[in-house]
Design a protein with these regions (language model features):
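Sec-dependent bacterial lipoprotein signal peptides
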Residues: 1-14
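C-terminal luminal/periplasmic domains and tails of membrane-associated envelope-modifying transferases
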Residues: 16-291
Length: 291
């Protein structure tokens, strides 16, 4: 199920008093792959910009995407990002469209959440003409473009990290970023939905450690190989792995096993250190979705 609401972008010509009078430089559409999504689940967000015939944007602006609750209070979730291509390369009449997959953070709030979009560079924001008439005089230039209904995490298939996982870690400069390192073999267990599923695995690999050739990753359901790939990405990458109901088997509990052909111990690397753990992949998200 998809929804889309269009808005128009205007170039910021100066301070905003009772309204923004700058001409729109583009029309933006926002859509989500799901109108209702559990906390912790992945969702595809699509942004489409139809650049106006006489538009001119000076420099590179970032897109901010903030989510607020039904009282207008911010939820600890945003999708701020650099558009591709950057705004300095946008041409009059051009259509810019791209999709980003994000995982909804687990927050205390459930219910309707409003998505607000803007375009900014430092303290400068471009004017938007959104679908909500009241936004025409919004001095914050954050424009309401859609609504997503957030469901409790219990609506998702609950995953148990059964074995082969190190404790969770957090980014020192970004506490919202969490990961767990796997060992050579890591097992996830969950109640068998007896349906086809998609297994989402977001991870990165130490390509600097395995510079001769990348680690080989194999995902099993029982004794069956459901996916095999090279971990040749230095940054985070998301794999969507289809698994059939037949591959999950008939048992009440299903398991997915992630194996790497090689591991490393940080303390044995040239940089040294005190970390003596056996590390495989750094996993940011693991999620099972019934199809």
């Amino acid at each position: 199920m998809r929804f889309a609401i269009a808005a128009a972008f205007g170039l910021l010509a100066g301070g905003c008093s009772k309204g923004d009078n700058a001409p729109p430089v583009a029309t933006v559409s926002f859509s989500a792959s799901k109108a209702r999504v559990p906390l912790g689940a992945p969702i595809d967000l699509t942004y489409k910009f139809n650049v106006a015939p006489n538009a001119a944007i000076s420099g590179d602006y970032r897109v901010f995407v903030h989510v607020v609750d039904d009282n207008g209070n911010p939820i600890a979730w945003n999708d701020d990002h650099d558009p591709k291509p950057p705004t300095s390369q946008w041409k009059p009449g051009q259509t810019i469209e791209y999709t980003r997959t994000v995982f909804v953070p687990v927050t205390p709030y459930v219910g309707d959440a409003t998505v607000e979009v803007g375009l900014y560079k430092g303290n400068d924001r471009l004017t938007l003409m959104g679908p909500d008439g009241s936004d025409k005089t919004a001095t914050a230039r954050a424009y309401k473009v859609g609504t997503i209904h957030l469901l409790p995490p219990s609506e998702s298939i609950f995953l148990i990290k059964k074995s082969g996982w190190h404790p969770a870690e957090f980014g020192a400069d970004n506490p919202g970023t969490e990961w767990q390192w796997s060992q050579k073999t890591a097992v996830l267990a969950f109640k068998n939905p007896r349906r086809d599923i998609t297994f989402y695995l977001e991870f990165d690999a130490r390509t600097d450690v395995f510079s001769d050739h990348p680690q080989q990753v194999t995902v099993y359901s029982g004794s069956q190989i459901v996916e095999s790939f090279a971990a040749d990405n230095g940054g985070a990458v998301l794999k969507r792995i289809p698994v059939t109901a037949a591959q999950l088997g008939d048992a009440e509990q299903a398991e997915l096993r992630i194996e790497v052909d090689r591991t490393f111990v940080p303390s044995k690397q040239p940089a040294g250190g005190k970390d003596v753990r056996e590390l495989g992949l750094r996993v940011y998200h693991a999620y099972v979705e019934a199809r």
